[in-house]
């Protein structure tokens, strides 16, 4: 078995290392999915249908992986999805992930159940951001969170 991230070469390797290193409840929180896990299954099935067949040593001098998501240009076709309680997994929590998203020129998703505030993250990084609202019974709290996200998260100009 591996004891180092340097020995991880695919998603399965990272998952096995996380399972070995993390306390069981934290691993299962990260490894699981919401509700009945239908979206998790659909995403997994979709990824299994993809074959990455590289065109080896052909046209690698000008590789451009950039894309546009919701009007925001990203340097890579991936983004850091909103995940609640990230300090459970790492001492920097959302702050560390937001910095990594900025470093790699991609979007960072802020969860309303995060361990860092919308203001803190928005003041720290200029990378494109989105906000995931967990709807609460308290409509006043929902309104306040939406207003904060409108103030602190850049919204691209819509073409319509």
Regions found by a protein language model. Name each.
Residues 23, 80, 101, 159:
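Conserved, mostly hydrophobic/aromatic
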Residues 76-78, 97-106:
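A short, Lys/Arg-enriched amphipathic alpha-helix followed by its capping loop at the start of a domain
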Residues 78-81, 106-110, 129-133:
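Hydrophobic faces of well-ordered beta-strands that scaffold small-molecule active sites
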Residues 151-160:
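Single conserved hydrophobic/aromatic residue that forms the stacking wall/gate
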Residues 91, 110-126, 138-144:
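Active-site-adjacent beta->alpha loops and helix N-cap segments on the catalytic face
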Residues 2-74:
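An N-cap/entry alpha-helix motif that binds or orients negatively charged groups
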Residues 101, 121, 148-149:
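Generic structural signal for hydrophobic
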Residues 82-91, 131-139:
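Active-site mouth loops of central-metabolism enzymes
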């Amino acid at each position: 078995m591996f004891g180092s991230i340097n020995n991880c070469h695919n998603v399965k390797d990272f998952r096995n290392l996380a399972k070995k290193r993390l306390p069981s409840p934290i691993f299962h929180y990260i490894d699981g999915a919401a509700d009945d896990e239908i979206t998790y299954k659909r995403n997994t099935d979709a990824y299994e249908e993809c074959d990455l067949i590289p065109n080896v040593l052909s046209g690698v001098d000008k590789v451009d992986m950039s894309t546009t998501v919701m009007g925001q240009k990203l340097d890579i076709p991936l983004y850091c999805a909103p995940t609640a309680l990230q300090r459970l997994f790492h001492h920097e929590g959302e702050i560390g992930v937001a910095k990594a998203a900025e470093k790699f020129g991609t979007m960072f998703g802020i969860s309303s159940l995060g361990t860092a505030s919308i203001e803190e993250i928005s003041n720290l990084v200029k990378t494109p951001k989105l906000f995931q609202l967990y709807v609460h019974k308290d409509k006043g709290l929902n309104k306040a969170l939406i207003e904060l996200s409108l103030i602190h998260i850049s919204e691209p100009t819509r073409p319509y």
